[in-house]
Amino acid sequence: MTSHPRDAPQFYLTAPSPCPYLPGQYERKVFTHLVGRRARDLNEILTQGGFRRSQTIAYRPACETCRACISVRVIVGDFVPSASQRRVMRRNRDLVGQPQPNRPASEQYALFRRYLDARHGDGGMVDMTVLDYAMMVEDSHVETHLVVYRKRGPDTAINGRGVGAPIAICLTDVLSDGLSMVYSFYEPSEADRSLGTYMILDHIERARLLGLPYLYLGYWVEGSRKMDYKAKFGPQERLMPQGWVRVE
C-alpha cells in the first residue's frame, strides 16, 4: 500500500465546462489547495510549472482536446517597451501605484463592480458579492499584496501616495523569481488610458527594481481576443512541453 506524507499536496480534476476563451471548446482544470506552512513553497514550484493562483487554490488547464492555454512570463531584464507602450506610460504619468497589504475596502469593491459590469458582464465573476471580493483579496497563505493606483497629489513626491479614489488595482504575488499578476481591474470610464497595459508595464518596472527576472502574466491563448494582448510584451518565455522557451 502506497503511503503519502501528511502534508503532500493532493491534486483534483474538475468536470468539463464551456471554455471562456475559445467558442465550442470545453475546459478542465487540475487543482490543489495552497494551505499550511508549505503553501508559499508549493505556490513557487507550481507557478514555475504553469499553475495560477486563485485564493487558496492553484490550478492549471488540463483540457482533453486542447492545449491552447500557454503560460507566459516577461523577461524583465531584456524588455524594451514599444513606441505605443511608451505612449501608454506617458499617458498615465499622473498616476502612482502604492503597494499595500491585501486587505479589502469598500472603494475597491466599488471599482471592481464597475469594471465587471462594464467589461465582463457575461463572465463567471459577474455575480461576485462584496464578501466574494474580500475572500479573493485576503484569503491567501502566500506572499501577496495589492498595488493601488491613484492620481498624483501635491505630496506624492514626499510620501509616495496618490489622492482620490483608486483608478486601477492589481493583486500581485511575490515569488523568488518574479512577480505574478493574479488579478487586475480598473476604472472603465478611463478606457483611453489603456490601464491594463499600463499596469503590466508598471509591474515590469517593479520587478526590475526588485531584481526579479520575470513577470508572470498567466495564460496566453492564441486566437482569443481576451488573452491575445499578452503576446505584445516581449521578449517573453512560454511554457512548452520541453520547458520554458524564449520568444522574441
Swiss-Prot record:
Any one GO biological process: ubiquitin-dependent protein catabolic process via the N-end rule pathway
User: Which InterPro entries does this entry report, sorted A to Z?
Assistant: Acyl_CoA_acyltransferase, Asp_Glu_LeuTrfase, N-end_Aminoacyl_Trfase, N-end_Aminoacyl_Trfase_C, N-end_Aminoacyl_Trfase_N
For this UniProt record, the keywords arranged alphabetically read as follows:
Acyltransferase, Cytoplasm, Transferase
Which molecular function GO terms apply here?
arginyl-tRNA--protein transferase activity; leucyl-tRNA--protein transferase activity
Q: Where in the cell is it found?
A: Cytoplasm
The record lists the catalysed reaction(s) as: N-terminal L-glutamyl-[protein] + L-leucyl-tRNA(Leu) = N-terminal L-leucyl-L-glutamyl-[protein] + tRNA(Leu) + H(+); N-terminal L-aspartyl-[protein] + L-leucyl-tRNA(Leu) = N-terminal L-leucyl-L-aspartyl-[protein] + tRNA(Leu) + H(+)
Q: What is its main location?
A: cytoplasm
Group of enzyme by EC: transferase
Family classification: Belongs to the R-transferase family. Bpt subfamily.
* Protein name as annotated: Aspartate/glutamate leucyltransferase
Species for this entry: Methylobacterium nodulans (strain LMG 21967 / CNCM I-2342 / ORS 2060)
